[in-house]
């Protein structure tokens, strides 16, 4: 389990997070959403230990992320949006170099995924398109046998068939021990894949809830007139899509783009209906926190 407690983080004097708390249990594919610049990538880097909190803790099964112990590192993989790849290397050489650090790497899985994604494992990266390179890295990431997989904009550069393949592969490969976090602004690409959903904004967590809980609290009405009580309305073919508080308990089809806009425009209402996590009292900094604070200044 990934646990984030009382997390503060800033780049010099620019605050990114202020006392946020999140828990990512295993067995789920989480959607991490937010406008550009709110800290989605920063949060992924904090989770895998590439950044240190100013205050608070980030742990994976009790191991402190920024300590980057080998026991933790072999259980987590982070795929950034862009990766600098050696022109003359190949996907097979790439995983050969990673193999010693990941004892659960499965060569057969890698080759199967490369075949499914229609990329040749021995083709040089310089001969590939950006999308082919991205598919190679996705195949590699899912072959390392880690419990935790962090994706930053994984569908960037993928064509429509490849996006469908990505969704299919991820849904099939999710196991009870896995936690997958997808940070993206292309929500349509992962709309039927992610559950729960986390939305970040202005140093805080605006929403942290399962799809079922969102549907209990909000109703998505399709094809009607624009409603004055709507948290968000959007004209679509056949009428308006309205997002309104769910007063009847009736279930509706979630639209993540509409949800995102409704949350950003109605922060207080989203908090009142119980979709925003309650902030916990900030604990006094420990000696480790103070040392971390110094290293970030």
Question: What are the residue ranges of the model-derived segments?
Answer:
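Conserved structural motif at the start of ABC-family nucleotide-binding domains
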Residues: 2, 17-19, 73
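Conserved ABC transporter NBD signature motif
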Residues: 56-67, 71-72
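Catalytic Walker B motif of ABC-type/P-loop ATPase nucleotide-binding domains
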Residues: 149-153
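ABC transporter nucleotide-binding domain
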Residues: 165-244
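The feature captures the beta-strand-to-loop junction immediately N-terminal to the Walker
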Residues: 33-35
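ABC-family P-loop ATPase nucleotide-binding domains
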Residues: 78-136
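Helix-to-loop junction immediately C-terminal to a conserved catalytic motif
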Residues: 48
